């Protein structure tokens, strides 16, 4: 096993931290909300999880770092058994178009431009490879949707998608998806 492959199997340790805000619980899972108003320790943890998640995606930069100056960014970290097992990073962005799945499949640009409208955008939705196929990504996104008070179907979605990410977005938004600026 290569070092890169080994890194992908190691979860990020996540014990309870002072000041954390647990916003959802089910079975053995908790979701902790982190923002730029959270403690340094929580923001550093969110960055470690975002860097771990980046290993499983086509992105070259993490969806969140401590240096992120966006006061509105929201990071949702799923914890189970003292390990971070899921992540959703949302931030408000202007959306400028609707991409139908027909246009996406035919590699056409979004056919329906819209006036720029602020909308929460999913920068990343990730679950640890050992925790996939359990509905965790959907549960974390539902928690995020409740927290930002916006339906999942109206979120913008950052691309590119992994194959499993595209399948997930197709399930969440069967007609198509909003494209952020």
Regions inferred by a protein language model and the residue ranges of each:
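Glycine-rich acyl-CoA binding loop
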Residues: 133-141
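Non-catalytic substrate-recognition and accessory regions of acyl/acetyltransferase enzymes
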Residues: 1-129, 143-181
């Amino acid at each position: 096993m290569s070092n890169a492959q080994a890194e992908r199997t190691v979860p990020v340790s996540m014990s309870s931290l002072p000041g954390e805000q647990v916003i959802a619980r089910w079975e053995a899972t908790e979701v902790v909300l982190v923002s730029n108003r959270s403690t340094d320790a929580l923001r550093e943890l969110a960055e470690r999880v975002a860097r771990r998640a980046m290993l499983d995606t086509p992105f070259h930069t993490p969806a969140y770092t401590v240096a992120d100056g966006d006061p509105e960014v929201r990071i949702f970290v799923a914890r189970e058994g003292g390990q971070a097992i899921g992540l959703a990073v949302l931030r408000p962005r202007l959306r400028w178009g609707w991409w139908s799945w027909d246009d996406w499949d035919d590699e056409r640009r979004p056919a329906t431009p819209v006036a720029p409208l602020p909308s929460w955008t999913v920068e990343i939705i990730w679950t640890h490879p050992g925790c996939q196929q359990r509905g965790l990504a959907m549960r974390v996104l539902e928690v995020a949707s409740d927290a930002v008070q916006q339906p999942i179907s109206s979120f913008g979605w950052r691309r590119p998608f992994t194959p499993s990410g595209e399948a997930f977005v197709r399930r969440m938004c069967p007609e198509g998806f909003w494209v952020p600026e």
